[in-house]
Amino acid sequence: MSLIPRPERSPGALRAACAVVAPGLLSAYDRAKDRALAEAVEHGSLKPVHAYLAHWAALIEIERHPAVARRYHCAEYLARLATTPEEAREHLTTASALYREAATWSGQAVSS
C-alpha cells in the first residue's frame, strides 16, 4: 500500500510528494535541486538535473511505501552501527537493493 500516488518526475511534483511522505527531507531536497541546477549551468548540461530527478524519484518511491521505508531506513541505520565491514556491507546491500528497486519503479509513468 502506498501513501500517495506516484508523482510525476518533475521538481514541483517531487517536492510536493516529499512534503507529504518525508517532510524532514525538504531542506535536503531543496539543496539537491539548487546544486543540480548550478551544476547544469556550470557544465552546460542537463545531466545533473536528470540525475537529481532520478535520485529523488527513487527516494520518494521508497517513502511512498511505509513498510519499504522502514526496511530501507533500518538497513541504513544498522550499517552505521555495524562493527565490522562485513556487517556494514550486509546492511548496505539490503538498502541498495531497495533503492534500485525503487529507482526501477519510479521510472514508470503509470501511478500505482
Where are the language model's segments positioned?
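Short terminal alpha-helical segments
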Residues: 1-38
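Intrinsic-disorder-associated interaction segments
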Residues: 3, 7, 42, 49, ...
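A structural signal for alpha-helix termini and helix-coil/disorder junctions
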Residues: 20, 35, 39, 62, ...
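Amphipathic alpha-helical interaction modules
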Residues: 25-69
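Amphipathic alpha-helical binding modules
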Residues: 70-112
